[in-house]
Amino acid sequence: TQAAEVRESISLTGQFAAVDEVLTGRENLVLVARLRHLKEPGAIADDLLRRFSLAEAGTRRVATYSGGMRRRLDIAMSLIGNPQVIFLDEPTTGLDPEARIEVWQAVKELAKGGTTVLLTTQYLDEAEHLADRLAILHEGRIIVNGTLDELKQLLPPAKIEYVEKQPSLEDVFLTLVGAKTDKEQR
């Protein structure tokens, strides 16, 4: 039926990772592929583990994964069956800065690959980095939507002032742990 086809083309990843911590990452993916009655669930799992930089961790129990790894696995599970549209509900809530960047990379790759990504976030910097179109909700209603440039045009022209930029705490953290910032990865 048409309704079934629509349901097959849409996937959802909730605010909190819905992974089975007793299973390995690969077992989680194989389980979902089997539940969707797909052929070659092992090959599907291996492909997604590679795509989400989890191949080395695939045989470990999910309980040993970091927050970012769990979120990437959760997103990978949502992609089983190749949905055309994926809803991500606050995918980086509660993650450390390094894990947030890992999830941002995964989301960018999805969009680059042709998947339509609908993402909710409370982090405005995240919306700026990831979205090509934005909708701002206030008190349960969409009050404006458009591209970032269109939304910026709603404000009066900015006054230019020279302000020396000091590194943020996030910049310090990412430098100390040797991670690349989102800007450095572009």
Regions found by a protein language model. Give the residues of each.
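Helical segment within the ABC ATPase nucleotide-binding domain
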Residues: R100-G113
